[in-house]
Structures are given as C-alpha cells and as structure tokens.
Amino acid sequence: MTWQSPISPGYSWYEATIPERPVFPIMPGSRKADVAIIGGGYTGLQAACNLARSGTDVTLIDACRFGDGASGRNGGQFGTGQRVWADETEEVLGREWAQRLFDMAENAKRYVLGFAEEHAIDIEFMPGQLSVGHKASLERDYRNHVEAMTGRYGYPHLSFMDREETVSRLGSSHYHFGIRDTGTGHIHPMKLVVGLARQAALAGANLYEGTKALKIEKKGGAVVIETTSGTITADRALIACNGYIGNLEPVTASHVMPIRSFIGATTVLHGHPEILPGGESVDDSRFVVRYFRKSKDGRLLFGGREAYTADNPRDISAHIRRQICEIYPDLADVEITHAWGGSVGITMPRQPFCREVMPGVTTIGGYSGHGVMLANYCGKLYAELALGKSTELDLLKQLKIPAFPGGTRFRSALLFLALSWYALRDRF
C-alpha cells in the first residue's frame, strides 16, 4: 500500500509513482555539527546539500520522512514571481522592491530547473501555465498585469487570453478569460524531493528521518536542539519547518500560519482530448484558489478546498469531485484514484518569512503557495549566507511581515472567519 504520511491526510499519487524512496535512519544519539537543520523538505535539503558540498559538517533531522509535508504533496506548479503579482507588490512596496522580489523568484525558477538537469533528476517538467478569471469584472486587472509584466518588468512570456482562447485551452466554458505564461511550468514534486535527498546524502550531509525536534535554544556560544533521539549541538541552525512548525519556535509560529489544501488524482482521461490539450497547469482567481493540471500520463490532478483548522474532510475525494464537476461536468463519473492533503505555510502579506529568531538561528518559510521554486532557492541562499558567499537572502529578512492576530490560541478562528468571508465573495 502507498505510504501514509502521519502528518498529512490521504494517500498521495506522487508517493505511488516514485520508483523508489530512500529510507534514512533515526539519529543514533547525540552529536555535534557545524550547522543543524530542522525539516527535510525543499528548503532544508537544499541547504544541507549545498553546505555539505562545501565541506560543512551538517546534520538534518525530520520528524517523519522527507517530503511528508508540503514539499512532496503540493500541486507541483512553479508559477512566476512571488505569490502576490509584482504590479500589486509595487503599489505597496514600490518599484525597486517589487523588481527585486520578482527577480529573486525568477532566479529560483532557473535554479530548480538547472539543479534537476545537472543531476539528471526526472522531475517530469511540463511547460506552461494558465491563470484564469472566474469573474468578468477582473478582466481589466488581468490585462493590466500582462501589460506591466511584458513592459516595465521585462517578462515577455505572458499573453492575454480572451474567452474563446480560454475555453479552447481549458476545454471548459467555466472561466471568462485568462493569462497564458509560457515561461513557467509544473513538475512531479516528490521526484524532486527524492532526487534532492540523494544528492544531499552523496555530498556527505548527515540525514535523519523519524527524529523530532523538541526544543531549540542558545546555550553559551552554541545552538542546542533537543530531539527524540538525543541532542544536537551546533554553531548555527536553520529552522525549515514551514507550515509544520507547531510550537517548536514561537516567532515562526506567530508569523507562519498552516492552512490545509487538498488534491485529487483521477484515472487517465481517455476520451477527453479537449481537456488541457496543451498540457499547461491552471490556477484561478478565487481567493480560495483552485489549481489543476494534467500529469504526463494524462491524469487530472485537481487541488482546492482549503481548510484553516487542523480538521480534515472525512472524504477528500467527494470534496474534490464537486469542484471538478463545476469546471468539467463530463467528469462527474470519473474515478478518483488518490486523494490527499497537506499544510501550506502562509503569511499575512503572502510573502516569505525569513528571520534570525535567536543568535545563529534562522527560520525560513511562509512561501504561501510558491514554495516549489522559492523553498529550493532559499535553502541554497541560506547555505551561501552561512558560507559567506552571498547575502541575497537578506532581501527577505528586510520584509516587514506582521504576526497573525489572536496569538496561537485564537488565530485559527479569526483567520477562519476572515477567509470564509473571502470564500463567500468568490461566489459573487
């Protein structure tokens, strides 16, 4: 049977379609390291890989298996830029900041694709993305975005799609218009996790699964991490837990909020050549976004139905099927072979959160749905910062990310009320 993550619900199609998932041991006792990393997703594994290649003694631990969180269970879409469009960011932070954040995200895109190519990791990259509008009133915003990106931001890969083109490229009349992006694409996220873990191990990183961090503190000149298998004493540490931070570190927990998102995978869509004939991924304009794409073998992978509490739907497939049928009524009876969920780490402004939470301890997360690119790149940037090679990560440290209101006790309830209001607005 497909592996069931103990921290994320459902059985993932990604898990079922990787040829072999390496197993790493539980940490065999207390140890010392130059750098300790908590979290075996994209950020942590990239940091470990890059540090180990430079001769750093690095120890990485994960409470479960690598990729059990968002890195191995997400929608697989790269996107372009940050989670918030660059022209919208410009209105808040100004032109220079918007450009720098956009350039960082584009660097991230190139880095991930280059890393996979360099190390012959078959991530099943498929080009293209369609961002589609569910309200006719949003057309001017979409047109303005294309003009801004192809103009002052110098990104030539966007084009506006009218209703006829949108219907043709989606195989559905559900949306009014859209934007086609030929400069991005989508991947099999778990294959990237597996390939990355193997590269980190080959580089000499000490990788441990099934080893949970219980406490992190500064003692004298060292960072001390208490775990279920002993203590790690390190010169510095990276917290790369994102939406799975729990109560480990309060600053991260107050700024990065986990929300649940769910995905279903259908059987291969024989007899439906009209659905996404170009193979692009799709995201829509709803606040509670729907995102979907075809796999290389022709399945529809459909994501949506966010949840803002720890509760999960009893039948993930039923929730996903209802949303599929709104867009593709002819798929009412299609078999959903796998359905799963996981936690996405978001911040209030939907920008990444990077902060030194105590001397020598950095936390990175809150990618807000753009982690396939950004999490990998931020792991690399952390390694470069630790090695004194680059300060590009400081760009994110300077962002003023506010804490969520209500503290850890009431923030879920407050966010549920606020986002339920936005979800209601999606319908009108």
Swiss-Prot record:
Q: What does the record give under GO molecular function? A: oxidoreductase activity
Q: Which InterPro entries match?
A: FAD-dep_OxRdtase, FAD/NAD-bd_sf
What cellular component terms from Gene Ontology apply here?
cytoplasm
- What are the protein's UniProt keywords? NAD, Oxidoreductase
The answer to keyword NAD applying to this record is yes
Asked whether the keyword Methyltransferase is assigned, the reply is no
What EC number(s) would the UniProt record show?
A: 1.-.-.-
Instruction: Look at the named UniProt entry and state the broad enzyme category this protein falls under.
Output: oxidoreductase
Coiled coil ranges (UniProt) are: none
Which superkingdom does the taxonomy of this entry point to? Answer: Bacteria
List the Pfam families. Answer: DAO
Classification via PANTHER family: FAD DEPENDENT OXIDOREDUCTASE DOMAIN-CONTAINING PROTEIN, SARCOSINE DEHYDROGENASE-RELATED
What's the protein here called? Probable oxidoreductase OrdL
**What is the organism field in this record?**
Rhizobium meliloti (strain 1021)
